[in-house]
Every structure is written in structure tokens, then in C-alpha cells.
């Protein structure tokens, strides 16, 4: 039975198999640290009177989360969040989901990046008014380099990405995916057009969705923000401890001879 939903189903342990030469597929979420702020009490006593409606309570819970109903993460494990941004139009819907990079543990106890993260684009055709058939969705994975192409795209520029999931294998050429991003004729935004030709299951489909200038700006802003996380640089930055760096440098004064400015 077809899934007629306004939003896609998001599996926690998704493992899509759409590998290509220009994109890497991994799974996982992002760990988020929470920071609190302490307010210092004052010596003055001030009486405050306020009126708060039930509607305000509702929106506050929707915005910040209701701690009484939200599940708590397992003890000792960081909270994991799975997010996505969706754009709905008359004939199709587009959802963009970030996928975290992968690391491997070294014998020294450190971790090394093994696979870059990526952005998973899911296109679903319309199945009625404000309904989309996500069982017939087509997916396209954007590598970090392809993301860089998009964020540097000018208002009148276009780009095209080609993927062959079976490149280098016996079924090479039987599945072709082409994503085109081109400006709208009136300059009001861009359109995303995903064409999929799959000779293995006799599929030849094209899904088109227009993106307004404002919607495109939101996507580009999100892409710029998440890009350092997709290449794992946030993990390196979070691991830097000034006291340890100072101790290593003092113990080895000649350390850093390979740096260009020390030559």
C-alpha cells in the first residue's frame, strides 16, 4: 500500500544504497551539547505581574520541547537528533536530510575520519492536494564538493550533477541520475529537476520542483552551516584543549618544524 504522507518517514538507522563516484553514503546523527545560563540573584525585591494564556504555553512547549513528554536519552550516551528541511509544492515535495561523517578508532585511542558526511535529497511526487507519495520517492546524495558548487551558485547560474550508483561494477550504466539546478525564467528563484533512468526496474521518471529565492536562501544558509560538520572538523575543534596543547609544546620545543612558517 502506498504511503500517502505530507512528510517522509525518517528511520533512525537508515542505510540507503545509492553509492556513486561523487557521493558517499553513511548513517548517523549529530550529538548536540546543551548549555545553560545561571542567573545571579539581586538584592532588590521586585513584584512582577504577568498574564499567560494556555495558547502561549502550547507554543512554548512546541518551541522548546515539553520535558514531561520527551524521551530522555540513555544514561551515559549523548542525545541524538535527526532533522530535515522540507519544501512542499503543487506537484512535488523536497526534503533535505544531513548525514553525519564516519570515524574509525585508531590503536592510539584517537579517531580518524573515514567517510565524509553528505546531504540526502528526497523527491516525492504529488498524490493529491497536500499529499505526497513517499513510497515512490527518488533520492540523490550531494557530496561536500557538490554542496560547494550549490552554495557558490550565482542567481543566474546553473549546475548539473550526474550519478551512476553502479559505477565500476557489472551494472554500470543501467541506472542514471541527473540533478539539474537552474534559475527560473523570471529570476524569482531556481528549480530542481531530478531525472532517474533505471533499466533494472524499467523506470524513467523526472521530478520537478520550483524553489523560490527565499527558500533557496534558507537551503544555502543551512548548507554553509552544516558543511564543516560533514567533513568532521567540528570533532577536531571540540577536541582541542588549551592546557594539553601548551603542555605538549613546552615538552617538545622543536615540535612544529614541519610547519611552513618554521622553515
From Swiss-Prot:
Induction remark: By salicylic acid (SA) and infection by H.parasitica.
Main localization category: plastid
Name of this protein: Single-stranded DNA-binding protein WHY1, chloroplastic
Statement: the UniProt record of this protein carries the keyword DNA repair: yes
UniProt-annotated location(s): Plastid, Chloroplast; Nucleus
Top-rank taxon: Eukaryota
Recorded name of the encoding gene: WHY1
UniProt entry keywords in alphabetical sequence: Chloroplast, DNA damage, DNA repair, DNA-binding, Nucleus, Plant defense, Plastid, Transcription, Transcription regulation, Transit peptide
Subunit field text: Homotetramer.
Sequence segments annotated as region (Required for ssDNA binding): 89-94
Organism this protein belongs to: Arabidopsis thaliana (Mouse-ear cress)
GO BP: defense response; DNA repair; negative regulation of telomere maintenance via telomerase; regulation of DNA-templated transcription; regulation of telomere maintenance; salicylic acid mediated signaling pathway; systemic acquired resistance
Motif (Nuclear localization signal): 167-180
Amino acid at each position: 500500500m502506498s504511503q500517502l504522507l505530507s512528510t517522509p518517514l525518517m528511520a533512525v538507522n537508515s542505510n540507503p544504497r545509492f553509492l556513486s563516484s561523487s557521493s558517499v553514503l553513511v548513517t548517523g546523527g549529530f550529538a548536540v551539547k546543551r548549555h545553560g545560563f545561571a542567573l545571579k540573584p539581586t538584592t532588590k525585591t521586585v513584584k512582577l505581574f504577568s498574564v499567560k494564556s494556555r495558547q502561549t504555553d502550547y507554543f512554548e512547549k512546541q518551541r522548546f520541547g515539553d520535558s514531561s513528554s520527551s524521551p530522555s536519552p540513555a544514561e551515559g550516551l549523548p542525545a541524538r537528533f535527526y532533522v530535515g528541511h522540507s519544501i512542499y509544492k503543487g506537484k512535488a515535495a523536497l526534503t533535505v536530510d544531513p548525514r553525519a561523517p564516519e570515524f574509525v578508532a585508531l590503536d592510539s585511542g584517537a579517531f580518524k575520519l573515514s567517510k565524509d558526511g553528505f546531504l540526502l535529497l528526497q523527491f516525492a511526487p504529488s498524490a493529491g492536494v497536500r499529499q505526497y507519495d513517499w513510497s515512490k520517492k527518488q533520492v540523490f546524495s550531494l557530496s561536500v564538493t557538490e554542496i560547494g558548487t550549490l552554495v557558490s551558485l550565482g542567481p543566474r547560474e546553473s549546475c548539473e550533477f550526474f550519478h551512476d550508483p553502479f559505477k565500476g561494477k557489472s551494472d554500470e550504466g543501467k541506472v542514471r541520475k541527473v540533478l539539474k539546478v537552474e534559475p527560473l525564467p523570471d529570476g524569482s528563484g531556481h528549480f530542481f529537476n531530478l531525472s532517474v533512468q533505471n533499466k533494472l526496474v524499467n523506470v524513467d521518471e523526472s521530478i520537478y520542483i520550483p524553489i523560490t529565492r527565499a527558500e533557496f536562501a534558507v537551503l544555502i544558509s543551512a548548507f554553509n552551516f552544516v558543511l564543516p560538520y560533514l567533513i568532521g572538523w567540528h570533532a577536531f575543534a571540540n577536541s582541542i584543549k588549551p592546557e594539553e596543547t601548551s603542555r605538549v609544546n613546552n615538552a617538545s620545543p622543536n615540535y612544529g618544524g614541519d610547519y611552513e612558517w618554521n622553515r
